[in-house]
Amino acid sequence: MNSKSSRITSIQIGLASPEKIREWSNGEVTKSETINYKSLKPEKDGLFDEAIFGPVKDYECACGKYKKIKFRGKICEKCGVEITESIVRRERVGHIELAAPIAHIWMTKELPCPSKISLVLDISYKEIEQVVYFVNYIVLDEGNGKFPKNFNFKEVIDLSSQKSSKETRSKLRKTLREIYESIDVEASMENAIKHKIARTFYDTLAESNMPFSIEEVFNFISSFTGMRFGIGAEAILELLKNIDLDKEYKDIYEKLRKSENTSDIKTKKLVRRLEAIKWLKDSNNKPEWMILKNIVVTPPDTRPIIQLEGGKFTTSDINSFYRKIIIRNERLKRVIQNNAPSIILNNEKRLLQEAVDALFDNASRKKPLLGKDKRPLKSLSEHLKGKQGLFRQNLLGKRVDYSGRSVIVIGPELKMYQVGIPVSMILKLFKPFIIHELIKKTDDEGNTKDPIVSNIKSAEKLILNQDNTIWPIINKVIKQRPVLLNRAPTLHRLGIQAFEPILVEGKAIRLHPLVTTAFNADFDGDQMAVHVPLSPEAVAEARTIILASWHILGPKDGKPIITPTQDMVLGNYYLTMEKLNMPGQGMLFANVDELKTVYQMKKVHVHSIIGIPTSAFPKKQFPKDGILITTVGKVILNDVLPEEMSYLNNPDNLEELSDNDIVEWGKDYRTFIEKKKVYKAFTKKTLSEIVNILHRKYSDASLEIVPSTMDKIKDIGFEYSTKSATTISAFDVPEYTEKEKYFEETDKKVEEMKKYYQKGLLTDDERYKKVVSAWSSVTNQVSKDIEKLIQKPEYLTNSIVIMANSGARGNISNFTQLSGMRGLMSKSYNYDQKQKSKVIKDTIEVPIKNSFIEGLTVSEYFNSSYGARKGMTDTAMKTSKSGYMTRKLVDATQDVIVNNEDCKTKKGTILEVIEDTKSGSVIESLNERLINRFPIFDVVHPKSKKVLAPAGEIITKAVANEIVDAGIDKVEVRSVLHCKEENGICQKCFGTDLTTNKLVEKYTAIGVIAAQSIGEPGTQLTMRTFHTGGVSSGTNIAQGFERLKQLFDIIPPKQWEKSIISEIEGKVSSIKASPDNPNILVVTIKNSKESINYKVPFDSELRVEEGDKVKPGSKITEGSIDVKELLKVAGIEVVRNYIIKEVQKVYRLQGIEIADKYIEVIIRQLTNKVQIQDSGNSDFFIGQIIDINTFRKENEKLILSDDKVPATAVNLIFGLDEAPSKTGSFLAAASFQDTKKILTDACVKGQIDSLNGLKENVIFGNLIPCGTGKKSNEDIIEEGNKMYELEY
């Protein structure tokens, strides 16, 4: 612990020794009683005893002798209770001394992790279980050597199963025969009796049902041979006590060194044993501590008894477990005192073992303890794991005070950093601050004054009655702190933003329309939550970082996220339309004010093309002086933009005006207007580009310019969408009559396919594919026709077309369905599906030929509604799957924080264009991939030798274009995949932050941002295997979300979609049919050293031809590559590039752009572990899995020192399910999945968690080690005050 700040800096977990438990305990619990049913006070020595756990009431003992704080620390002579606060009942523990040793269930059970006792003793876990549960005996000592050894040390004597029972009996009889043959009967009477006993045992053991206790036989054999047999946890305890860990470690290590193959089962088990023994050796945990001699009784307030109405009580399940343990323990003590026969004794011990097992882990027992309602009781393990467990319910997420929620409505009158909060909500949320102002005795300058009310009660009354005196105070109080707004589901960081509250009437929260995209909110009944930041630091952080007006660009792609939508787009589109021959065309205005006046007098139309001198815009740059030819609307729009910004006239070239837009003085500008090419209006895309320009030019100069300009654009958008009076009507739908000719053709084709199929010339799969493909192309053709149709001049003023063209609402697909045809509908593909078929039939092959305007027939309506409903269920399924994936991504990357400026690595990732090798289409161009990265070496022009991009300097958009234009197709750049930083990554390897276009700041939690950027668009990915351009490829390869899951979880593709890959570099020497099987092709790949034959099913699509060159990992057949196979064949670099390419393919096919570097962050976490093959002179052991940077560091030391051999290792790749549990933190891992396994391993290891990630620190209530968590509080508050002054 860090004493200065009382901040916990690391935590260790381990096995508790019996002495340690007694040291923690405040007393032994010996009675199973809880509370007295009459007085309701805790019973003495019971599970709630005040003497052990502390007083029930603050500073009051049980008998009432001492009351009040003045006796603090005193212990009552009468009842033994310490006088202190009652909160200690949440901290103090007791213990139960067990009458017999008990094995801990986490250490004996095989699942979810290999049984630790089994690994240490090298006895199978089933045998351990049989010994612990008193089924079988185990040999503890082989004897004195006078007799031949019939039983080996640690051998389990199985008497339960028929087969092994027979073997055991014959071994026992053999031993007994040796004994009675060695006895000299003549020597004494005693010998004769012993001989007789041995004979009797010998004869009786021939039968399967024995009339005596087997223990008598063991005791008899023991007295002669010195052999000892044990049963129960006591026997295991003795074995664990006597084990020599150092000797075991050396033996296993030698065996591992000699073993050839590290992947066979025997070697894997040896590695697991070595690991367990090394953990115990290094952690100072003793193996015998895995067997319990006493158990902790948890604090009573964590397992309360609660009184319900009607005098009934309800209690935590944990109490039932403890009661059972205490009852059985006390009974066992009595049985031992009374010297009961061993069969009764063992039975009692077994019952106690089961009771303790149930307390620790009830669910994993074969027959769990059930409650009254026949459900299994919740044991300590269940209290930890899952969504309702301690980690996720209580430690990582808590419910928050000072919060409210309500429905949201649009607030077009708000500024971008404002939110309208209903009065009733403000009165509740800001109540303590309002009361403080009401009872305050000093004014803001510090002078004394009379308070408005004298006490809190009166203040509350004023608030309740909404007295007039409180309004000035409320207005003052709400200015002091912003509020946080959150909309669930919070898929990325923009799901929570800060706003300055404004009082509004009604009960709904008013939300600024521009932030709806970031929240993914709409106004159809969505609700949002409001939270109030309390501390000065939280207020300052909300203002400096979370305030809505700073979030201009989205983190996933660096594109504007506050682009105007819907009405605002429509208004701006209408405003910037250009039409010839409108009222007022050709008028010349002296300045903007004159133009506005004439427009308000309705002498000129908003679409009219007019002239205005360039001198009317003194601060703007023009290519030349003269008369600017533009429209009234565009002048109005440019008037709200910053004065220095260039004049926006042509949406195709916003950055600069062309000479044609300006007519020199003295020339006839009116004739020019009549001949002028009419520019298009500003669409949503144009507005997005304007935001980009604004952000690029002004975000450094002054923070408030961009948001205030956006507010003005929003205002004129709403104003002119109202003025445009755009409406929607059935008569606006374009008329289209061409489709019948396509239908006739395609119907003939479909009939033809049917005939071919009936004659056996086509398979059903081929027929289906061709039919679906034919109808898809008809729909595409109809779609193209309608697209041409609505571009005709007569449709340019059509309301629906305006909405679609502007990007406000609707697209070409809606038009196709409205006036063309609905086309093909999807169906669920396991409906009537033969499993053998390679084609997923997820489309109804009869299309809907009618359009909505014509109306659908009954069968069409049915198919249509079937498809629509499937869409709805898919969306619901997708949302939950995508949410789970985001959680896994966050867990895998939560400790990736930018911790350093430069790790000085000399290795990088080679970037080249990502293209679909099959179709040759570019998925992501090299320009896009290069922007915002640092090259490792100078990028030099191949011809002129000019340095285009110096090493270590950022590549801008212009430089990236230069590099590509120079014909360079590969550039090695810095990448997080090769960052040498041990904790987190460095600034240079990541490059620039997409939201600021500057170098990423130190302490940014880039891992979480990466996870959110990939997870957030996950819901937009399709669930169905969609077909690009009809049905392109014959096979159905998982696409969309399923493909993403395959890549990140490292799931091998299914047999039919798996691609066969080459293992060597060489040439395809031949492709022939197999002589044994005509359905199989044999592809032979040859090089100078070897040749390999690959068997390929006849119906697979080949990717190679004879004579093609292949590399290791090249595809031989079409499909998805198994990543683990690729890793073996081609190495980690190829695998990393393959995953980046495939993930980008999934997203970009859906039109979603994500920066490469986020995918790299995820891949870094999945591929940053290696497994030791040979330890050399290092401290690693063979088979150990370690972090790649640790491995590199250790090897660098070994290479620099003389005569030392470095270790060798192979790269591993883990899926998202495993990656979080491989991080250094057991707390983060345990709070993710497999809680039991991770905590068990950590205990045996004695693992130390140094709290480097975010989750671990949240659990301990520390500030997280990123962002402002690394700054001082004074700095944060100062920044907050600066920001407050900036608000416009």
UniProtKB/Swiss-Prot annotation:
<comment type="subunit">
    <text>The RNAP catalytic core consists of 2 alpha, 1 beta, 1 beta' and 1 omega subunit. When a sigma factor is associated with the core the holoenzyme is formed, which can initiate transcription.</text>
</comment>
<feature type="binding site">
    <location>
        <position position="524"/>
    </location>
    <ligand>
        <name>Mg(2+)</name>
    </ligand>
</feature>
<protein>
    <recommendedName>
        <fullName>DNA-directed RNA polymerase subunit beta'</fullName>
        <ecNumber>2.7.7.6</ecNumber>
    </recommendedName>
</protein>
<feature type="binding site">
    <location>
        <position position="76"/>
    </location>
    <ligand>
        <name>Zn(2+) 1</name>
    </ligand>
</feature>
<feature type="binding site">
    <location>
        <position position="61"/>
    </location>
    <ligand>
        <name>Zn(2+) 1</name>
    </ligand>
</feature>
<dbReference type="GO" id="GO:0006351">
    <property type="term" value="P:DNA-templated transcription"/>
</dbReference>
<dbReference type="InterPro" id="IPR006592">
    <property type="entry name" value="RNA_pol_N"/>
</dbReference>
<dbReference type="GO" id="GO:0008270">
    <property type="term" value="F:zinc ion binding"/>
</dbReference>
<keyword id="KW-0240">DNA-directed RNA polymerase</keyword>
<keyword id="KW-0862">Zinc</keyword>
<feature type="binding site">
    <location>
        <position position="522"/>
    </location>
    <ligand>
        <name>Mg(2+)</name>
    </ligand>
</feature>
<feature type="binding site">
    <location>
        <position position="979"/>
    </location>
    <ligand>
        <name>Zn(2+) 2</name>
    </ligand>
</feature>
<dbReference type="GO" id="GO:0003677">
    <property type="term" value="F:DNA binding"/>
</dbReference>
<keyword id="KW-0808">Transferase</keyword>
<dbReference type="GO" id="GO:0003899">
    <property type="term" value="F:DNA-directed RNA polymerase activity"/>
</dbReference>
<keyword id="KW-0460">Magnesium</keyword>
<dbReference type="Pfam" id="PF04997">
    <property type="entry name" value="RNA_pol_Rpb1_1"/>
</dbReference>
<feature type="binding site">
    <location>
        <position position="526"/>
    </location>
    <ligand>
        <name>Mg(2+)</name>
    </ligand>
</feature>
<dbReference type="InterPro" id="IPR045867">
    <property type="entry name" value="DNA-dir_RpoC_beta_prime"/>
</dbReference>
<dbReference type="InterPro" id="IPR007080">
    <property type="entry name" value="RNA_pol_Rpb1_1"/>
</dbReference>
<feature type="binding site">
    <location>
        <position position="903"/>
    </location>
    <ligand>
        <name>Zn(2+) 2</name>
    </ligand>
</feature>
<dbReference type="InterPro" id="IPR000722">
    <property type="entry name" value="RNA_pol_asu"/>
</dbReference>
<dbReference type="Pfam" id="PF00623">
    <property type="entry name" value="RNA_pol_Rpb1_2"/>
</dbReference>
<dbReference type="InterPro" id="IPR007081">
    <property type="entry name" value="RNA_pol_Rpb1_5"/>
</dbReference>
<dbReference type="InterPro" id="IPR007066">
    <property type="entry name" value="RNA_pol_Rpb1_3"/>
</dbReference>
<feature type="binding site">
    <location>
        <position position="79"/>
    </location>
    <ligand>
        <name>Zn(2+) 1</name>
    </ligand>
</feature>
<dbReference type="Pfam" id="PF04998">
    <property type="entry name" value="RNA_pol_Rpb1_5"/>
</dbReference>
<dbReference type="GO" id="GO:0000428">
    <property type="term" value="C:DNA-directed RNA polymerase complex"/>
</dbReference>
<feature type="binding site">
    <location>
        <position position="989"/>
    </location>
    <ligand>
        <name>Zn(2+) 2</name>
    </ligand>
</feature>
<dbReference type="InterPro" id="IPR007083">
    <property type="entry name" value="RNA_pol_Rpb1_4"/>
</dbReference>
<keyword id="KW-0804">Transcription</keyword>
<feature type="binding site">
    <location>
        <position position="986"/>
    </location>
    <ligand>
        <name>Zn(2+) 2</name>
    </ligand>
</feature>
<comment type="similarity">
    <text>Belongs to the RNA polymerase beta' chain family.</text>
</comment>
<dbReference type="InterPro" id="IPR042102">
    <property type="entry name" value="RNA_pol_Rpb1_3_sf"/>
</dbReference>
<dbReference type="InterPro" id="IPR044893">
    <property type="entry name" value="RNA_pol_Rpb1_clamp_domain"/>
</dbReference>
<comment type="function">
    <text>DNA-dependent RNA polymerase catalyzes the transcription of DNA into RNA using the four ribonucleoside triphosphates as substrates.</text>
</comment>
<dbReference type="Pfam" id="PF04983">
    <property type="entry name" value="RNA_pol_Rpb1_3"/>
</dbReference>
<feature type="binding site">
    <location>
        <position position="63"/>
    </location>
    <ligand>
        <name>Zn(2+) 1</name>
    </ligand>
</feature>
<dbReference type="InterPro" id="IPR012754">
    <property type="entry name" value="DNA-dir_RpoC_beta_prime_bact"/>
</dbReference>
<keyword id="KW-0479">Metal-binding</keyword>
<dbReference type="InterPro" id="IPR038120">
    <property type="entry name" value="Rpb1_funnel_sf"/>
</dbReference>
<dbReference type="Pfam" id="PF05000">
    <property type="entry name" value="RNA_pol_Rpb1_4"/>
</dbReference>
